[in-house]
């Protein structure tokens, strides 16, 4: 007996419609965007708290800079990565597809590349080492990841494969078959479990880059696990009949994460 997907309107409130220069606009606040906003505010609070306890190594102004450019990196990198990794054929046929944000579509791995680019800039601007910045950011990233997965669940998207487990759900866009609620698995692993793991690990190591390595390792492993029950992207399917794109992109994260954790102390 499958569970029914909760009928949650993805739109919290609509504004308008407004007529501007002959065009009708009806902006709306959606749960998906709201969950990311909550995650961003929570991450800002935690980073400011870390800055206050850093004995002068970080100021709140520097944290604000980090958050601003990090946010840009997530949005731009996430969208560009989604288009290039998962819908490159659409992009080749119509490059303007990149700007159709209203249709949805964000990639974690693209967002990660965007954040890394932002951190490189912050490294230069604030005259820090790259991993000093990365180790500051890594422990709060799971908050945004978890918030985003709740948004995916409310939208009824990114559901899992067909299953007969007792907690399987029938999703409105997933056909009549009961499926794994893989968004909730990702919330539990990439959000809650990874946050707790990084919090615990950050208290037990002072090695530069180790916390960043644990983030890469933990996320990569959790993503590979969940991808085994998450429905592969229809336009991509399985590579070699075995791996999803998400798993392929996670393998380098696992390997580099292991390197950062195990490399000799003091090696930059």
Curated annotation (Swiss-Prot):
UniProt key word ATP-binding: no
Keywords associated with the record: Cell inner membrane, Cell membrane, Membrane, Transferase, Transmembrane, Transmembrane helix
GO terms of molecular function: phosphatidylglycerol-prolipoprotein diacylglyceryl transferase activity
Pathway(s) of this molecule: Protein modification; lipoprotein biosynthesis (diacylglyceryl transfer)
A Pfam family assignment: LGT
Localization per Swiss-Prot or TrEMBL: Cell inner membrane
Membrane-traversing stretches: 27-47, 66-86, 104-124, 130-150, 181-201, 208-228, 242-262
Positions that bind a 1,2-diacyl-sn-glycero-3-phospho-(1'-sn-glycerol): 149
Enzyme Commission number: 2.5.1.145
Any one Gene Ontology cellular component term annotated for this protein: plasma membrane
Protein topology in the membrane: Multi-pass membrane protein
InterPro entries: Lgt
Family designation: Belongs to the Lgt family.
Physiological role: Catalyzes the transfer of the diacylglyceryl group from phosphatidylglycerol to the sulfhydryl group of the N-terminal cysteine of a prolipoprotein, the first step in the formation of mature lipoproteins.
NCBIfam families per the UniProt record, alphabetical: lgt
HAMAP family linked to this entry: Lgt (MF_01147)
Descriptive protein name: Phosphatidylglycerol--prolipoprotein diacylglyceryl transferase
